[in-house]
Amino acid sequence: MQTLQTTSLRVVDNKLWILDQQALPQQKNWLPADNTEALVGHIHALRVRGAPLIGLSASLLLALLAEHGMTRDALGQALEVLRAARPTAVNLMNNLDRMKQALTQPDFVAALGAEALRLVQEDRELCERIARAGSELVKPGSRLLTHCNTGGLATAGVGTALGVIARAHEAGKVANVWVDETRPLLQGGRLTAWELGELGVPYQLITDSMAASLMAQGQVDAVWVGADRIAANGDVANKIGTYSLAVLAKFHNVPFYVAAPQTTLDPACPNGAAIPIEQRAAAEVTGVAGSFGAVQWAPEDARVYNPAFDVTPAALISGWVLDSGVVTPEDVANGRFAG
């Protein structure tokens, strides 16, 4: 396979490398993903994360395994193991469905390689379309609030919600970005803050519980988030805490936008109640670990509830910005996502 580089993925000498997003921003470590077990481990540990990026990393690995001589049957088994790595992220399922089709071709090695590279290029292009469509909704002088991380670290391109902010900033329309730290794993504080700093976008980091106070003071003009899955009725699964922001935004009459690619749509999923929600380890809540080491603050026997995602009802969303354009609540009510 040709050499490939994104913010978080590399293919060099027919080997897949991932940027360890658990070590950022203090350390920039590239880790190998030589086999299915290694990549699944990286996904579970959130060293590679973001719904689009997870799908792309799995697709690239399958293509590389094929080039290294793995049989068709073994590749089919590897594909299903990868499919189970992150159940909420429908991009992974959609990408692997396309790779599964490529696997049926007579020259499956070439077909898998071509399809994986096509998926990367498509993601770059659709991120740009999302970013430009969304930036048109941003008013001059806007103070925007975002949650989790939805930029180049989570995609092959400029990103989804963070891509919108980046393009709006280039147009001179962003006065400030409020960055939720995004408990418990701090993707906002670690990753989004780092990306915005690299882009030169003015931002201020806040704890998740400060959003209500800012909205009450009129300090937030719009909220922009990404999505891991969008159901047929417009309900959105995204990083835990998104639902809270949507409720706050509705109460304070602040527009709440979701930016995501078409591949995040799941027409077969009728509503948010049907979306599987990943439950994660208690240690993520009882303490914190990073390049600085590990600290535990909760009692050893503390019981923990730690869902990775929550579901935001469509009724709380002002608009869905896809690579195909802006979808309104009226469009969704008329079955736009129902397939």
UniProtKB/Swiss-Prot annotation:
Q: Which residues cross the membrane?
A: none
State the reactions this protein catalyses: 5-(methylsulfanyl)-alpha-D-ribose 1-phosphate = 5-(methylsulfanyl)-D-ribulose 1-phosphate
Q: Which residues bind substrate?
A: R49, G50, A51, R86, Q187, N238, K239
Query: Which residues are annotated as site, described as Transition state stabilizer?
Result: C148
Q: Enumerate the Gene3D superfamilies for this protein.
A: translation initiation factor eif-2b, domain 1, Translation initiation factor eif-2b, domain 2
Q: Name one GO biological process term.
A: L-methionine salvage from methylthioadenosine
Any single Pfam family the record assigns to this protein: IF-2B
Pathway note: Amino-acid biosynthesis; L-methionine biosynthesis via salvage pathway; L-methionine from S-methyl-5-thio-alpha-D-ribose 1-phosphate: step 1/6
Which keywords does this Swiss-Prot/TrEMBL entry list?
A: Amino-acid biosynthesis, Isomerase, Methionine biosynthesis
Q: What is its EC number?
A: 5.3.1.23
Top-level lineage group: Bacteria
Its Gene Ontology molecular function terms?
A: S-methyl-5-thioribose-1-phosphate isomerase activity
Please give the PANTHER family that the UniProt record associates with this protein. METHYLTHIORIBOSE-1-PHOSPHATE ISOMERASE
- What job does this protein perform? Catalyzes the interconversion of methylthioribose-1-phosphate (MTR-1-P) into methylthioribulose-1-phosphate (MTRu-1-P).
Please report which protein family the annotation says this sequence is part of.
Belongs to the eIF-2B alpha/beta/delta subunits family. MtnA subfamily.
Q: What is this protein called?
A: Methylthioribose-1-phosphate isomerase
Originating species: Cronobacter sakazakii (strain ATCC BAA-894) (Enterobacter sakazakii)
